[in-house]
């Protein structure tokens, strides 16, 4: 929905290509290079579509900051010949947000939303029902006033990650939040 909205704002065509990354066992069992394997599958599908439509290049949104942290997916970007114009021109995440806001892009202030598979430890099987459970819990916490939240699973332990400045409010609300999260199937919770 968000991509469709932004494409409409930009006057671009929006096309959804379906890829089930979890059909591939090497991705489903969450190896350290999962992002690489996943990006390779996604860009492979996109590249085939681009060739069919005679599109000469594919662009993606890596920025300068992304080049200085662990991003195994960048290897696939390079291998597949996908261009990263923001990074190529040295735009940082903050500069991208500022420019997007100046241009009136509706999602300029939207917090980043990394893949839900990052919420599971390497080697854990990624199952759709687990990802859905995590997504529901994070959505619940966002509705309760925690706009930046990650819920990471470590076996039976769910670790809630929020900015430190929200700890106090979370602790004040724990009598409401914790039972609700436990009812969603999270046995043990940490902050």
Where are these regions (language model features)?
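ATP-dependent adenylation/nucleotidyltransferase module used to activate substrates
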Residues: 1-102, 143, 158, 176-186, ...
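Peripheral terminal appendages
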Residues: 132-190
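Proline- and acidic/polar-enriched loop/turn elements at helix boundaries
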Residues: 19, 62, 111-113, 153
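Charged, low-complexity surface patches
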Residues: 39, 89, 130, 169-170
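Alpha-helix N-cap and loop-to-helix initiation/capping positions
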Residues: 2, 30, 34, 126-129, ...
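Mid-to-C-terminal catalytic subdomains of enzymes
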Residues: 87-93, 97-141, 148-149
């Amino acid at each position: 929905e968000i991509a469709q909205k932004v494409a409409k704002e930009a006057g671009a065509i929006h096309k959804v290509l379906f890829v089930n990354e979890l059909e591939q066992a090497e991705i489903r069992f969450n190896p350290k290079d999962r992002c690489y394997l996943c990006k390779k599958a996604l860009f492979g599908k996109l590249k085939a579509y681009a060739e069919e439509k005679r599109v000469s290049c594919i662009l993606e949104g890596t920025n300068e900051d992304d080049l200085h942290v662990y991003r195994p997916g960048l290897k696939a970007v390079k291998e597949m010949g996908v261009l990263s114009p923001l990074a190529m021109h040295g735009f940082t995440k903050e500069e991208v947000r500022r420019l997007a806001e100046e241009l009136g892009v509706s999602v300029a202030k939207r917090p980043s939303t990394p893949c839900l598979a990052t919420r599971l430890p390497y080697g854990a099987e990624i199952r759709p029902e687990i990802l859905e459970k995590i997504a529901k819990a994070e959505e619940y916490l966002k509705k309760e006033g925690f706009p930046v939240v990650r819920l990471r699973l470590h076996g039976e332990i769910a670790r809630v990650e929020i900015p430190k400045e929200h700890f106090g409010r979370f602790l004040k609300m724990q009598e409401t939040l914790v039972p609700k999260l436990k009812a969603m199937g999270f046995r043990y919770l940490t902050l």
